[in-house]
């Protein structure tokens, strides 16, 4: 969905960072897939136990950007009847990019700094870093025919509003699980190369978080900030 571009010559492109061998695209025809963006923020607090933080939106849509189909409308109705918001969108790819816009930025920054969303957004240096990464990602998306429906400032404000939420990447790093780096950041780096778009800030953060992931894998370790004992 992210890499199927309307740009000439790139419609058949496949992002190797998320489908290295091509087995997903070969095994599951695109026509069998319905796009959905999961907006609720949550936290894995125990095996099999997920704590819901906020959010109830699950936008859905056909991948080819066609008008709503019967199957999409049925899925939307099921979500709605269960108490969720599931609007049917004509351009689900743009909505996926909107979600990715924040994920590729806040996830690695939080993983490297061990900070929550509100901490990142309210600290001037990391807020500007996030904005720089988002500007670069937006340039990549524009070359792929994607237009964002919200401004950069509004997207950052939305992340700040979530509050003291620990991102999924930071949760993985603290728990010693392999962080989801390539799907969230590496894909955009790959698409930037495909579209000849410079992304210096994204590249730098990607290199750092990849090195962290490599160290965790080699040491079978986790990285967590621990409070120090204060002498009486």
Task: Please annotate each region the language model reported.
Residues 19, 23, 71-74, 96, ...:
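Exposed alpha-helical structural elements
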Residues 85-89, 111-119, 147-149:
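Short, structured loop/turn "capping" segments at alpha-beta junctions
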Residues 119, 127-232:
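NAD(P)-dependent Rossmann-like dehydrogenase/reductase catalytic/cofactor-binding core
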Residues 3-95, 99:
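Rossmann-fold dinucleotide-binding core
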Residues 54, 93-121, 125-138, 164:
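Active-site-proximal catalytic alpha-helix in oxidoreductases
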Residues 33, 67, 101-105, 129, ...:
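A generic short alpha-helical patch detector that favors 3-5-residue windows
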């Amino acid at each position: 969905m992210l890499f199927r571009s309307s740009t000439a010559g790139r419609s058949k492109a496949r992002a190797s960072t998320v489908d290295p061998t091509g087995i997903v695209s070969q095994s599951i025809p695109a026509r069998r897939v319905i796009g959905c963006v999961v907006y609720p923020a949550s936290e894995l607090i125990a095996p099999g136990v997920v704590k819901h933080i906020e959010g109830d939106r699950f936008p859905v849509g056909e991948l080819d950007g066609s008008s709503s189909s019967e199957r999409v409308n049925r899925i939307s109705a099921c979500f709605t009847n269960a108490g969720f918001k599931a609007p049917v969108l004509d351009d689900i790819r743009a909505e996926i990019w909107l979600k990715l816009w924040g994920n590729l930025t806040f996830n690695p920054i939080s993983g490297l700094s061990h900070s929550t969303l509100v901490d990142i957004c309210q600290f001037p240096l990391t807020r500007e870093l996030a904005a720089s990464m988002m500007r670069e990602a937006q340039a990549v998306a524009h070359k792929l025919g994607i237009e964002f429906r919200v401004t950069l400032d509004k997207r950052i404000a939305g992340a700040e509003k979530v509050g003291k939420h620990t991102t999924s990447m930071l949760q993985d790093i603290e728990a010693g699980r392999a962080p989801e780096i390539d799907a969230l950041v590496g894909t955009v780096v790959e698409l930037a190369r495909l579209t000849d778009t410079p992304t210096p800030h994204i590249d730098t953060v990607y290199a750092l978080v990849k090195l962290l992931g490599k160290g965790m894998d080699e040491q079978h370790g986790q990285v967590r900030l621990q409070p120090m004992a204060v002498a009486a």
